């Protein structure tokens, strides 16, 4: 899951899980795996909500893993009511079965170890037993992955990994001997299989290529949007299934070989530019993230436009009321936007950082509430106000309208871990939200970016947009499952491209 665990962000009344595994080979040579389903009770639903509120829908950028002292395969995915997609692998000989998240936001494979005796999270899941495998090779090197809300630690081992009918030999992976219970205890998967670029160990995907197991140097995801169907989705190694997309893919080059990262252009709410990414932003497609995360300044505008109710932040309103008209005057006087807040002594830097890089955890419940922390928040709110007001000035809005709009946005600020609810009866009046990728607009309808939890009168509607500001990579969007459901996604390792086409 990359650098911070991507959560089951919503809970559910019924959950569909993999069924007795059935392997089949179709006429196109692709291998498919049968699915099963299982009911989950109300307790599981509440646990899923708790995981969200603990902030697990957010990445902690900068993967902090540490090390110390000839065909194609199709993996069927299970759709956890639109909150996560996972499938089954085997480790060892004979294969020991594990359910894993196939995660394009990280590169390491880990599963619980039988030597994990003090963690409830380990005991609640399948655990790898090295003594039961004839192909196990000892390594013993310490390994750890630190997430935003917890961590796993353990040691590296080596064994065969079975995916579909492919057997990847001598694969390094972490046997987790300790897992953060608050993060992993109630998860419906055992471990994570990373599909990003190599960091501290050779990824499974690299070994597939090195061992000549796939025809093409690319893999692709199709995520089924119909949660009531048994088939949750499909991951194809070594190619793509033409039955799961329409038209041609739009490809963009990978800009940073750590995540599957690429450049995007403007983000639009309806037909209106938000302006922030018009000069260019970075994004990456992340199969291990449930929602769609982006810069607070823009996500706040989106959630305001769809009527999502978040946290009223009085400090934000204080900045707008005290400094808003001065900000407008400076913007109209053509003062460089990234210097305005330092001119007003709200920020200590002078244009050295972009807006997104200084928005760290504005409303993080764990923030230090010292005077220094408060000063940083005032700086952050000022920078966000500059972004909002600059865009409204471009729309020729009056000063009063700009101030009122900024105050409204303050009311819709939220933490990355907070559920933002909308009125389920207003979906038809909500705008589409579009991302410009490769010069083409990829739109999301309300039905695609709003997630529904529950049934009947108990149904709740949740915004699929969550705020998250990267501190190292600048303004960044994580295009998670909310985006990958409507768009079939190709990860082309051979040409270092990411491609999107309408899913079928």
Curated annotation (Swiss-Prot):
Residues 311-416 form the Saposin B-type domain. It is an enzyme of class 3 (hydrolase). N-glycosylated. Glycans found at Asn-139 include approximately 6% oligomannose, 82% oligosaccharides of the plant modified type with proximal fucose but without xylose and 6% oligosaccharides of the plant modified type with proximal fucose and xylose. Glycans found at Asn-432 include 14% oligosaccharides of the plant modified type with proximal fucose but without xylose and 86% oligosaccharides of the plant modified type with proximal fucose and xylose. Residues 25-68, 310-414 form a propeptide. Glycans are attached at residues 139, 432. A motif (RGD motif) lies at residues 246-248. Detected only in pistils, not in seeds, roots, midribs, bracts, stamens, pollen, vascular or supporting tissues. Detected in seeds. High amounts are detected in the broad outer region of the upper portion of the stigma, towards the lower portion of the stigma it accumulates at the periphery. Within the stigma, expressed mainly in the epidermic papillae, lower levels are found in the cortical parenchyma. Present mainly in epidermal cells within the stye (at protein level). Expressed in young flower buds, and at lower levels in seeds, pollen and bracteas, but not in roots or leaves. The record marks 68-69, 309-310, 414-415 as: Cleavage. Its EC number is 3.4.23.-. It is found in: Microsome membrane; Protein storage vacuole; Secreted, Cell wall; Secreted, Extracellular space, Extracellular matrix. Its main location: membrane. GO terms for biological process: lipid metabolic process; proteolysis. Stable at temperatures of up to 60 degrees Celsius. Optimum pH is 5.0. Active from pH 2.0-7.0. A motif (KGE motif) lies at residues 455-457. One of its GO terms (molecular function) is aspartic-type endopeptidase activity. Aspartic proteinase with a high preference for bonds between hydrophobic residues. Cleaves alpha-lactalbumin but not beta-lactoglobulin. PANTHER family: ASPARTIC PROTEINASE A1, BETA-SITE APP-CLEAVING ENZYME, ISOFORM A-RELATED. Heterodimer of a light chain and a heavy chain. An intermediate form (35 kDa and 30 kDa subunits) is produced first, and undergoes proteolytic processing to remove the internal plant-specific insert (PSI) and the propeptide. There is some heterogeniety at the cleavage site. Interacts (via RGD or KGE motifs) with PLD1 (via C2 domain). This is Procardosin-A. The lineage of its organism: Eukaryota, Viridiplantae, Streptophyta, Embryophyta, Tracheophyta. The gene is cardA.
């Amino acid at each position: 899951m990359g650098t911070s665990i991507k959560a089951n962000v919503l809970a559910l009344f019924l959950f569909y899980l993999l069924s007795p595994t059935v392997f089949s080979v179709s006429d196109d040579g692709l291998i498919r795996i049968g699915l099963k389903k299982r009911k989950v009770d109300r307790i599981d639903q509440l646990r899923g909500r708790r995981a969200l509120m603990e902030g697990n829908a957010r990445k902690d950028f900068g993967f902090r893993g540490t090390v110390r002292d000839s065909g194609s395969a199709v993996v069927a995915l299970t759709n956890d009511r639109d909150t996560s997609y996972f499938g089954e692998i085997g480790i060892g000989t004979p294969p020991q079965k594990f359910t894993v998240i196939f995660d394009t936001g990280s590169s390491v494979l880990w599963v619980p170890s039988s030597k994990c005796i003090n963690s409830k999270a380990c005991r609640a899941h399948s655990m790898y037993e090295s003594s039961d495998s004839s192909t196990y090779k000892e390594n013993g090197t310490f390994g750890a992955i630190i997430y935003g809300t917890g961590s796993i630690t353990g040691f590296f081992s080596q064994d065969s990994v079975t995916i579909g009918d492919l057997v990847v030999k001598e694969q390094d992976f972490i046997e987790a001997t300790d897992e953060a219970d608050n993060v992993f205890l109630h998860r419906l998967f055992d471990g994570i299989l990373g599909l990003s670029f190599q960091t501290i160990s050779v990824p499974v995907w690299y070994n597939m290529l090195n061992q000549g197991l796939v025809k093409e140097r690319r893999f692709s995801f199709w995520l089924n949007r119909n949660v009531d169907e048994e088939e949750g989705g499909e991951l194809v190694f070594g190619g793509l299934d033409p039955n799961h997309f329409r038209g041609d893919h739009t490809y963009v080059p990978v800009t940073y070989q750590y995540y599957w990262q690429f450049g995007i252009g403007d983000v639009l709410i309806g037909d209106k530019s938000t302006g922030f990414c018009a000069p260019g932003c970075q994004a990456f497609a992340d199969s291990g993230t449930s929602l769609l995360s982006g810069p607070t300044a823009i996500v706040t505008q989106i959630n305001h436009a769809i009527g999502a109710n978040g946290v009223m932040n009085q400090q934000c309103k204080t900045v707008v009321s005290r400094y808003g008209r001065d900000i407008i005057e400076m913007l109209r006087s053509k003062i460089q936007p990234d210097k305005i807040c330092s001119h007003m002594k709200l920020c200590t830097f002078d244009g050295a950082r972009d807006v997104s890089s200084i928005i760290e955890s504005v409303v993080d419940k764990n923030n230090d509430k010292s005077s220094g922390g408060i000063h940083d928040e005032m700086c952050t709110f000022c920078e966000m106000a500059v972004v909002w007001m600059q865009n409204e000035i471009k729309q020729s809005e009056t000063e009063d309208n700009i101030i009122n709009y900024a105050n409204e946005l303050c009311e819709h600020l939220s933490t990355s871990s907070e559920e933002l609810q909308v009125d389920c009866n207003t979906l038809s009046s909500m705008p589409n939200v579009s991302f410009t990728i490769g010069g083409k607009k990829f739109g999301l309808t309300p039905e695609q970016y709003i997630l529904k939890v529950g049934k009947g009168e108990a149904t709740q509607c949740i915004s699929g947009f969550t705020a998250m500001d990267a501190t190292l990579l600048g303004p960044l969007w994580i295009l998670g499952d909310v985006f990958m459901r409507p768009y079939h996604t190709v990860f082309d390792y051979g040409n270092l491209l990411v491609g999107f086409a309408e899913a079928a």
